[in-house]
């Protein structure tokens, strides 16, 4: 049999293939389509409010009766100090001027208008809404949340970008670890926002496999049978794909963003903190080049909240220079088939 069965049995799915939780790209329709293909769909809840999380969970359950993972950010929320307030004002002024110079009309929010939601609200929602799988990134859950979730029979999937992070997750009793290589698209799942591990995926996977006794999912660069086989040989028992689905019918990317993806070159794929305040891998553009090495980057989630309106305005203008188009290092042809078809094709290719 081609597929390892540890993850299948733990998660109650047919194939140990996981649709990556890509906030802003994956949709409830994508989650349901992944489930229909016999894979695990992942509902990206990021750092949404409890009410927003409930709405998306219920929408997903209307589309599928199969299990899916809810995915949340478990980041540290920086204290609002006088220094942060001053930097926020300067950054807001700089970004508004940058937008104006590039014919983007937008009013960015003040600090008082920004809502920050601790992940504990989402933990309560996930229990109340009877979700059975929770995946998380940007750190580790606190002990009390882990206990509550386990008491309610919820399987926990943590994200690591280093061996040390994997060991911390294992020590906390996390059921499954998702190993994210630095080549992966989107946000780095690192516990630290600043000094992120730089280790490549294959090196990291083999080392984590040697150090922990927890089933491993691998994320970063899987786009076909050869890449999946490579990480399977190194110990992965589950396989998370994101890039593969970026241009799918269920993707939230707009046509101009999908077209930009098709033309992307290797040297244009970069790590940046400019949009959100945390490192993420995506397509280099004017915004990144202007902001990345400036003093106008706030800590996450404040930078993310501040730039949100600018990104939305740029998207409405179909301006790829001021939106975050997240993509990993593995450049390939981006299929515009449905998520279900793309995943079934991957499964068929692997089983040949």
Q: Where are the regions that the model predicts?
A:
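Active-site entrance/lid segments in N-terminal catalytic domains of soluble metabolic enzymes
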Residues: 1-194, 198-211
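Conserved active-site-proximal phosphate/metal-binding subdomains
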Residues: 187-217, 222-352
């Amino acid at each position: 049999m081609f597929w390892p069965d540890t993850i299948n049995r733990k998660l109650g799915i047919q194939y140990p293939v996981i649709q990556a939780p890509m906030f802003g790209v994956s949709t409830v329709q994508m989650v349901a389509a992944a489930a229909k293909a016999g894979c695990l769909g992942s509902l990206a809840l990021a750092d949404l409010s409890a009410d927003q999380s409930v709405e998306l969970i219920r929408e997903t359950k209307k589309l599928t009766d199969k299990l899916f993972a809810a995915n949340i950010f478990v980041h540290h929320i920086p204290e609002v100090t006088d220094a942060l307030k001053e930097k926020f004002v300067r950054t807001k002024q700089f970004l508004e001027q940058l937008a104006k110079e590039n014919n983007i009309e937008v009013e960015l929010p003040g600090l008082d208008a920004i809502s920050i939601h601790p992940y504990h609200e989402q933990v309560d929602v996930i229990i109340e809404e009877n979700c059975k799988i929770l995946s998380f990134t940007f750190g580790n859950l606190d002990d009390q949340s882990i206990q509550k979730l386990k008491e309610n029979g919820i399987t926990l999937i943590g994200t690591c970008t280093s061996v040390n992070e994997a060991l911390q997750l294992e020590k906390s009793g996390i059921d499954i670890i998702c190993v994210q290589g630095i080549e992966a698209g989107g946000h780095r799942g690192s516990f630290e926002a600043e000094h992120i591990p730089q280790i490549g995926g294959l090196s990291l996977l083999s080392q984590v496999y040697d150090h922990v006794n927890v089933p491993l999912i691998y994320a970063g660069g899987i786009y076909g049978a050869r890449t999946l086989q490579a990480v399977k040989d190194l110990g992965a028992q589950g396989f998370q794909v994101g890039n593969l689905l970026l241009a799918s019918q269920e993707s939230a990317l707009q046509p101009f963003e999908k077209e930009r993806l098709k033309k992307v070159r290797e040297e244009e794929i970069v790590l940046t903190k400019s949009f959100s305040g945390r490192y993420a891998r995506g397509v280099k553009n004017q915004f990144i080049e202007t902001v990345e090495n400036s003093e106008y980057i706030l800590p996450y989630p404040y930078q993310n909240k501040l730039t949100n309106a600018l990104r939305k305005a740029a998207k409405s203008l179909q301006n790829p220079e001021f939106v975050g188009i997240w993509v990993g290092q593995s450049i390939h042809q981006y299929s515009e088939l449905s998520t279900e078809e793309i995943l079934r094709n991957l499964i068929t290719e692997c089983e040949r």
